[in-house]
Amino acid sequence: MRKSLLLSSLLFLSISAIANMQKMSSSGEIIAQDSEKWSCVIDNKSSLIWEVKSDKKGVQYAMNTYTWFDGNSGRDNGTFTKNCYWGKNCNTQSFIKDINKAQLCGYSDWRLPSRDELNSIVDYYGDSDLLIDIDFFPNTQMDSYWTAVSVNSNPSMAFEVPFFYGGSMARDKTIDTFVRLVRSAD
């Protein structure tokens, strides 16, 4: 009985999470759940809009990685690598600037998520080893994604969320890591 109740609860939580997500077009319109092309996802439960990664080379290419830099703090004054499609300025500040300039889904206030925000889309009850709903977030890598949060005791590090076990951990800001941007829907 207890086992059935636990399984029912987990299934309800998983279905509830999915019901709260909606796909958005590149212009910011809500589109059908079965659409095969979308650029953002709105999570109605958290009132957050998330960037969706692409399998095509470009600014939102899923394989692009970035060093962490916000223009105010960081390490080596914004050191960047060349692990993004355009091959220059591959740090988080430049990526955010490029996405805001392009007005992804009609908005220009994209940013790195907090630890709690990024953990809110971790799906511990899904059907794959990747801890995210790939029906809404395809092309997500089984790796870590930067948050906006620096480590207080060591400002040369920032927190990241690994989508292979959840939670968060600290990483040196000069190490290339994946990025998924967010904005408030309010």
Please annotate each region the language model reported.
Residues 2-8:
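Sec-dependent signal peptide recognition
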Residues 5, 17-111, 115-186:
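Glycine-aromatic-enriched surface loops/turns that form tight recognition elements
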Residues 10-18:
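Hydrophobic h-region of N-terminal signal peptides that target proteins for export
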